[in-house]
């Protein structure tokens, strides 16, 4: 790759890292073109993007990007060979779940690491966040948790008012009789 092409590739990766600062690194060696295309389609449905990397250029982009330059991220020997970065904005658990489900049927996709909200994750960490509910599910659970006690209070107030109304009705019927 010519020097200018490398500079452009680093700039492109740097831009992706600054707009989508959460990512998963995965080894895709052995996957067919059809399998990679299928994985990319699933990831696009979740608002994510998969980019095949040159490891040294990605490491350089990490060090230069505003979101990651203060972190000491290095690649060890386990990061040799063909790697792809799967970029996500804020839905990394959903992306991790897509990768985990895909890897069940395609043993050649091996998740190596991830980066989420300032924390470097190993393969086990990425696997753990794959089990987390999505952002929408968490918001629904929070709303349900808030709504439940409010509904109980409203029901209790309605019961008090209803029992008061029944007592007044009974008193009125007793006085009329």
UniProtKB/Swiss-Prot annotation:
Signal peptide segment: none
GO CC annotation: cytosolic large ribosomal subunit
GO terms assigned for molecular function: large ribosomal subunit rRNA binding; structural constituent of ribosome
Keywords attached to this entry: Ribonucleoprotein, Ribosomal protein, RNA-binding, rRNA-binding
Matches recorded under Pfam families: Ribosomal_L10
InterPro entries (alphabetical): Ribosomal_uL10, Ribosomal_uL10-like_sf, Ribosomal_uL10_bac, Ribosomal_uL10_bac_type
Transmembrane regions: none
GO biological process: translation
The keyword Protein transport appears for this protein: no
Family in the record: Belongs to the universal ribosomal protein uL10 family.
Quaternary state and interactors: Part of the ribosomal stalk of the 50S ribosomal subunit. The N-terminus interacts with L11 and the large rRNA to form the base of the stalk. The C-terminus forms an elongated spine to which L12 dimers bind in a sequential fashion forming a multimeric L10(L12)X complex.
Summary of the function given for this chain in its UniProt record: Forms part of the ribosomal stalk, playing a central role in the interaction of the ribosome with GTP-bound translation factors.
Protein name, UniProt field: Large ribosomal subunit protein uL10
Natural source organism: Leptospira interrogans serogroup Icterohaemorrhagiae serovar Lai (strain 56601)
């Amino acid at each position: 790759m010519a020097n200018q092409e490398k500079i452009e590739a680093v700039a492109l990766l740097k831009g992706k890292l600054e707009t989508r600062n959460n990512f998963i690194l995965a080894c895709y060696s052995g996957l067919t073109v059809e399998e990679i295309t299928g994985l990319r389609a699933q990831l696009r449905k979740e608002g994510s993007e998969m980019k095949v990397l040159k490891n040294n250029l990605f490491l350089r982009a990490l060090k230069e990007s505003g979101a990651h330059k203060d972190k000491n991220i290095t690649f060890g020997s386990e990061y040799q060979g063909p790697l792809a970065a799967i970029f996500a904005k804020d839905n990394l658990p959903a992306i991790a779940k897509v990768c985990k489900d895909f890897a069940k049927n395609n043993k050649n996709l091996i998740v190596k690491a991830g980066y989420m909200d300032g924390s470097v994750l190993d393969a086990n960490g990425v696997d753990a966040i794959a089990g987390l509910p999505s952002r929408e599910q968490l918001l629904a659970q929070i709303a349900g948790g808030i709504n439940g006690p409010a509904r109980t209070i409203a029901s209790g107030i309605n019961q008090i008012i209803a029992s008061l109304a029944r007592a007044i009705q009974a008193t009125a019927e007793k006085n009329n009789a």
